[in-house]
């Protein structure tokens, strides 16, 4: 039985992954299943699939991993389908909040799934309530689908344009009616969305590995501000705004941590970007050591880059238990320590007596770095110098990532030297913002969002959401 979890590891969390297909020669429910399975890393709380055969639409949803929700695949026939995996950044982790959501419009049923986070949800929700709408979830996704369902515009493309006039924030959306499938990406391009081609149909997905999972070919990224419509006539593209109308806000954390290393996103190979981050770390801070190790799995590729640049051998020092159950973890230091020990265990022969350069991708709350360092010390490490392949996280994200309130972010309150002392490392270095931008070499720095590091948000965010450092207690 799936239970809501208190996330015990010190990482930010992506909100979700989306997938959709239009193909008369394939079973949509099977292809969507494989697609969202390939996106499981983007959300583990719930999963859902909507399928239509052109006449009847049906949605199947549940709490848990894709394999838990769909132990037996539905027998629903259909050539159009969308799917979703979720980690909740807005809305509670309850069955009502599982996506896709389905609604009735004047043109018939529609279903929608969303990756991202709106910054004007409350205002839109109030306005819809005044117009007589009722809500059964606490998600911004329900606001989106109700705005679409209420639209009186004559075409779906015009309905999406009207929607994009209303909503602000991050969104990569897939939707379907009984006749077509749609996708759109916000004008800043915060969240990823790609277009793929099967032999006889078309696919939309958050990341390219979902295309690989069903043997679809990558065609291109959906552009920021683009609306795509897919039906029996093929693919049509409509731009809500010119792609160069303003600077974009592509999320840098996709490249640091969220995306699968085998993804290609906005023209950038994720694996290469992470190798570059490791090499940049060595350029900025040439720690001496006997071995380079990673905190698995998120630090693996950057550690390989650091080892290659430095000439210090890379060895596995921490073994990750890939079969650990999704157990509810109560807050508290002892239980947090137990959770980390369940997940990671030192390989003593590679640790004992060694001067270790340890590579991880980020420190957010600072709750587990000290536990990991203590594990290595207890296994006999002589020295532990920690390198982080991103800058200090000092500001919250409002665009689809759960990075906690500002008062919970350790780097917002303490200096690097203080954090180093608190976690028990012998030295600590964060990758510079410039080094990070140079590592993501296929995208211009001005087209990326680094707000969680520098506090410069691409668009207006609620003032009270920035958090006061005065109310730390």
Residue ranges of each PLM-predicted region?
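Flexible loop/turn segments at secondary-structure boundaries
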Residues: 28, 89-90, 120, 190-191, ...
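Secondary-structure transition/capping motifs at alpha-helix termini
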Residues: 133, 154, 284-290, 308-315, ...
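Conserved short alpha-helical segments that host acidic/polar catalytic motifs at enzyme active sites
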Residues: 1-224, 229-289, 295, 383
